Amino acid sequence: MKSIQIDKFGGPEVLVIKDVEIGKPGPKEVLIKNLSIGLNFIDIYHRTGLYPIPLPSGIGLEACGVIEEVGADVSLFEAGDRVTHASMPIGSYSEKQIMPEEKLVSVPDGISDEVASCITLKGITAEYLLHRAYPLKKGDKVLYHAAAGALGQILCP
């Protein structure tokens, strides 16, 4: 299968399309055919080495796809289910990837692959900021520094 990989840190020129082998899903894992991927600043941080990752490596944390195969003991999903994720392991810039079932979210029929693949990480971040980092209470005021960005559009309807 084709996968965008990096062998060294740097600019966009270090992104290389390679043919790579993908194994079978192990216990509690699924094989996903990626239909759409999300592009995020953290991908750039990984590519440049600002947030170092072991090399060589695939790149990308966010995708939407269809499960092609399930490993042993998978109980939440089955082949044919449409799912999204925004988490490790890195490697969503690829045709397929293996993911732990616990990292997946079902995608409702009314949401396109493109929307599902680009909103998941931002949605998780919004939930974390508003409910975990500092649980907002009635009357709290919030200053948004980047309301025009993807996260800002979720936080500032």
Regions flagged by a language model, labelled:
Residues 1, 81, 139-141:
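Nucleotide donor/acceptor-binding cores
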Residues 10-17, 41-43:
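Short N-terminal binding/cap micro-motifs at the start of the first secondary-structure element
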Residues 17-22, 64-66, 96-98, 104:
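Conserved hydrophobic/aromatic beta-strand scaffold that supports enzyme active sites
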Residues 21-38, 48-91:
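Glycine-rich beta-strand-centered segment in the early N-terminal region that forms part
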Residues 85-146:
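NAD(P)H dinucleotide-binding glycine-rich loop of Rossmann-like/cofactor-binding domains
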Residues 148, 156:
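N-terminal Rossmann NAD(P)H-binding glycine-rich loop of SDR-like oxidoreductase domains
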Residues 151:
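Hydrophobic/small residue at the entry helix of a nucleotide-binding pocket
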